[in-house]
Structure formats: C-alpha cells, structure tokens
Amino acid sequence: MIGTEANVLDRILAERAARLKVAGATFGSRLPSLRSAPLVPLASPAPSGVAPGAGEHAPFQPAAQAHGPALFEIKRRSPSRGVIAEGLNAVEQAERYHRGGARAFSVLTESEWFGGSLEDLIAVKERFPDCAVLRKDFLQLPEELEVSFRAGADAVLLIAAALAREDIAAMLEQAAALGLAALVELHDRADLEKVAPLKPTLVGINSRDLRSFKVDKLTPPALAAEISWNCRLVFESGIGGYEDAYFAGCSGFHGVLVGESAMRNPERVPEILAGLEDAYGVARARGRSRVSACRGNPRFWGELASRRAALQMGRARPLVKICGLTTAADARLAAECGADLLGFVFAESPRRAEAALLEEIADLRCLKVAVVQADDARCSHQGSAHRRSGARHGRHPDGSTDARAAASPDTDTDTRADTRADTGRAELQPEVARLLERGLLDAVQFHGGEQPADCLALAYPYYKAVRVRDARDLELACEYRSPRVLIDAFDPERAGGTGKRINPELVRQAAERGALWLAGGLTPENIGAIVAEYRPELVDVSSGLEGAAGRKDPDKLKRYMEEIADVCTV
C-alpha cells in the first residue's frame, strides 16, 4: 500500500509508458484479430434540457435521469488499499455481481498496480456478451482503443489528469469511430477546464483524488454544478451501499462506478441499485420507496460544495453557519454579513424557531437547516456503541453546540449494515416535513439519538451531530453516511447551548480524519485563533453571538465575520 503523500498517478503513468514502449499497446496479450462480441451501450443518450450545472435553481427531475450506468469493478489490488483479492477469478466475480442485478462491469487491465490484464476483460466479455464492459486503465495512446475494442470492451476510461487535451480529443474521435463509449474522468476544476471545449457526452467525476487517494464525496456534486454542456454523469468512488448510491442519484448523477466496497461485498449490488432507483423516483412511482417522503433541496450538498469552492478561489475562509436564529432581522443580518447557512432549532429550547419565520425569510439565498431531534425511544439502537452514544444525547438540541468537526471516511469500503429506512416508528416533526417539502428548508441536522439506520428514513438531505466525550465517539461519527458529520462536545445535562468547547486534542484528531466542521463555544474573541490553528471547513456559532438567548447581538455578529476575514486574507 502506497502512502497518500506520494503522487501515485505520475508513477503509474511513467511506469506504464515505459512498458508500453517495450511491449506495445497489447502489453503482450494475445487478442483476436476481429471482435466477435456485440457492442453493448454503456448508457442511453443524455436527457435533453438543462445541463448538469445550468444554474443553482435549475429544475431537478430525477425520474428522467434513470437507466444510467451502474458499473461494478473487478480488480485484485489497488495503490490505496493494497491487496484486495490476489487470486481473484475475474469471471467468478462478474458472476457474483450479475446475480445481484449488475449488467455493467468495470475491468481493471493495469497489471503492476492493480493486478489486472486484458485477458480478464476478454474472459468477462465472453461470459457476459450482453453486458456492458468498461476497460479501466490509464490509457495513453489512441491505438490502445482499437486493442480495447478487439478485446471486447464496450467502453473505455479516459482520465483527464493523465492526458493532454489534444490526446483526449484524438481518443474521443477514435472511440466514436469504433463505436466505443468514452467515460471521461474528472477530479478537479483543472480537469474540467481541460475537457470543457470537447464537451464529452459521458463524464465520470471521481471523489478519490488519484494523487493523494483521499475521498471527498462533495467533490463530484461540486464539479457537476460547473458543467455547462449536456452529458450523462457517473459518480466514481465513495459508494459503499444504499445511502451513498441514493446520495449520488439525488445529486444529479445518472450512474455510479463502485470499486473496493463491491469487490469485498458483492452482496451489496442489489442495495446499491435500489439506492439509485429510489433517488430517480422509479421505486417511489411503483410504491416501493425505502426512504422518507420528506425531501428538501436535493442540490443541498452540491450548492454547499460550490460555495466552498468559490471561497477557496478567493479569500480562503471557512463556510459560516449562524444557528439558533429566531427573528427575521437576525436572519437577514446574518445573510448580509456573509453567512452561508442559517440554522433554526425545532426542539424545546429558548432558541426554538417558528415555522412562520421561514415564510418571512423565503427570499434569502442562504441555505437553511432545521436542527431537530428524533425521540430516542423511537430510534433504532444497533450495537453497544450506538446505545452508549444515544444515552448521551440530551433532549434539547441547540444550534449553539459546543464543538463539531466533520469526520469523512477516506474509503468507499463500508462493512456496516444497509442503512435503508427500516427503523419503524421514528418520524420527523410534521412542521419540519412541511417546510422541507415546500422548499423553505433545505436540509436537516439530526441532533438526537438517531442511529445510522434512522437518518435517511426520516429526511433527506441531512447531516448528523454526534456528541463526543472521547476518541471512541470519533469512530462512531464515521459510521454515519452523510458527507459531513458534526461533532459536538459532551454535556451530561444538555445537548447544546452550554458554551463549552470540545477537547482540543479531539478537534485535532477529527481534523486529521477529514474536512473539519467546528462550532460551539465560538466567539468573536476566539474565532480568529481557532480558524488559524485548525483550518475548519465550516464554523457553526449560536450563543457566542447572542445578547440574550435567541437574539443575536449585531456588533458581535459583524465582528465575528470580520475576525474570520482578517485571519483568512490571502
């Protein structure tokens, strides 16, 4: 397994180019002179209408996006995870996927780093001639596409980071001449700018950075929002099960490419396919949806990621959430001062918001989040760690929580149980459900004893707040499948509003796990030092800006934003 600091992509490309020069485009494999297998389309044409990023308020119609490719990968090892299944029989793995409903496969043919070969591709296509097969490799020359075609590939992967624009253009032209689909893979804005003039019709966005091998599930929706042409989108990496597939579909992606998690757990294929179906509305139309009917803004995570990207291009400040708002005047002041998210508590608290407030501020462009707590007695409790954490969660959640950090797993492996909506009686407050469905709220922050299997059953989009007493709770936070998890300081009496700050060592550990969201105990006096030390992705404040409970002090709010701007000036 290679350390994440190494630029593995450059090493793979250099070593492969040397082998290519010696062995040629077949890498020594014996191929048929003519293709015998039928060409199977990888994806239907992109739907007409708005492009993926045609404005943040573009209509979202997931039912029209169904039938995108769901690709399941066949590989023996990887640079990030080492050996997965060294003695793997590629055909047998494809058979496992096929039994679960898969009809498209991604076959790694790179030998040195992934343990694959063209023989694997040939064998899989011979066994499943009616299924679509993608050749996944670090292709470098147009003549490699003819080799792929003869070997039986129906599609090829073109990695934008590995190719010059003129090479991508030549390979797209060659693929079209052969009848092959070309999945053009992006990782960042530089890749997007490189391929934009070419307008590829099938685009994969990888949540795993090939240079560091870290995963960030917000990368694909952020890049998708910037695509200006009509195309089909495939979410690559970070898909561990049902909820991840549902997230991808709700984020506007037409399909997924699933790697290590499917390799290790091929029984996950049906739930991943079901997650896509539910996101597209197919299962709901048939009366079989597994998720709550309470849906807010499906583009919430994409819009949040786009805001993050915009901030990183200028003054690289964190996202700012102002929580515990109870008046329109405070909400408007927060928006005027530059807040990215506004938080509203819907639980017993001196900061409880009224539904009428959301009506009054419907014109504000900030993302709006409800802070809620499902009744612990109605939430499922799976495992002693969950019960232990659930017992700690108080009954008075507050946006002014003590300290939170986002802990984002850096792998698409998920050994946990399916997190579909099967938890029974837990329900979202009716007023919050109505506000979500009317578009007056964008998302929900669950702040109670909700377990990983509860959250998606209650509402979407959501993220979870977990109260942390020690490092074990940081591990618990990673069990939730939302792209970010808020981590709150533990208090035996209240779930929030205490003004306490989390142990600095726990904050440091959380920051090392992934993008850090930090809140609670934040004030204009300490925010500059905190941002400078921990570089959080998001800071969340409530009581630290108050003159009285539920009422913001305008001077404190303005000074808070100024302190953040000062420390982040570049």
Residue ranges of each PLM-predicted region?
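Conserved, mostly hydrophobic/aromatic
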Residues: 12, 72, 97, 148, ...
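Glycine/Thr-rich beta-alpha phosphate-binding loop at enzyme active sites
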Residues: 76-88, 93-115, 187, 194-224, ...
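An N-cap/entry alpha-helix motif that binds or orients negatively charged groups
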Residues: 2-85
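Glycine-rich phosphate-binding active-site loops on the catalytic face of alpha/beta enzymes
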Residues: 147, 151-167, 204-214, 253-272, ...
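C-terminal helical cap(s) of enzyme catalytic domains, especially alpha/beta-barrels
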Residues: 217, 222-226, 262-303, 307, ...
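Alpha/beta enzyme core
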Residues: 86-105, 127-128, 142-155, 171-182, ...
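Catalytic beta/alpha-barrel core
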Residues: 105-114, 132-141, 154-165, 180-189, ...
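Catalytic cores of alpha/beta
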Residues: 140-151, 189-198, 239-256, 327-337, ...
